[in-house]
């Protein structure tokens, strides 16, 4: 490519000295330069720009510092994976649209940036792009060995073990991805209240046991100690946390929003089905990924690597074919998602997520179930 870049200049010098009588000599290099300049201008005009909020830029800088300077790694699998974050955002967006009263009978009348359907498409597109891009452009060299290990078939429990453990374990990671569990609705119903109290009693003991572990593991023990310790759920859904939903129920259920949710759902008579649809929506089917293969990166990695994608995303989108209208709508939804990450960055970007390479290796040798 360097040779091609120098050729026009050399040819032009020769023609200036002795090629004045060649009528078609000058236009060729001049025309080529004009074409190249025009191509560069077109590329600049088509360049996709995704501004990253300053607070998230700082998170990227911190991420680079922890990985490259302090030689740390993100502990995998993450408690809150990329799929859960995207699913959480779509529900957040949908609930906000419902709260704003934007319930047009014909979806095409809604502005693109307020379209729940486009929001869901954006989230699914990010998930797919993340799964493909992570091993190619989103990892530092120090993370390659960890990636090879966590994507191996021996890292995760077999499907049968996962299914049997799911019924016994009380320490499943925060929603990966799944709708809110029906424990609160069962507790409100009355008959199962004693059982709930027993669970809370057991959970209350867990933090005392967790103090025996090293400080490096404290974040994991604290996050998984009890349902109340899943900090992101109430913070990310302050209006929806009191709204139970049965994932297997086809008919609408009675909603019992608390003080936080009362303002959110005030005056929403007749919208029970819409609220249920928001809360029960899933980014991927229940049977994904198949049990015979390791989960994709979006089930293993979290916010740290998802944010890295937005650094590479302009280049990736620039190589895709979009109409101006569709690209504008997509960029608007990406901007809204980045604002969401910035607003809740304290929940997603935890310093305690970075552990020593030794501890990261230990967690890889002792894999945890992905739910």
Swiss-Prot record:
InterPro entries for this protein: MRG (IPR008676), MRG_C_sf (IPR038217), MRG_dom (IPR026541)
Bias kind Basic and acidic residues: ranges: 8-44
Gene source species: Rattus norvegicus
Assigned keywords, A-Z: Chromatin regulator, Nucleus, Transcription, Transcription regulation
BP-aspect Gene Ontology terms: chromatin organization; regulation of DNA-templated transcription
Gene that this sequence comes from: Msl3b
Record flagged with keyword Zinc-finger: no
Designated name of the protein: MSL complex subunit 3B
Main location: nucleus
UniProt superkingdom: Eukaryota
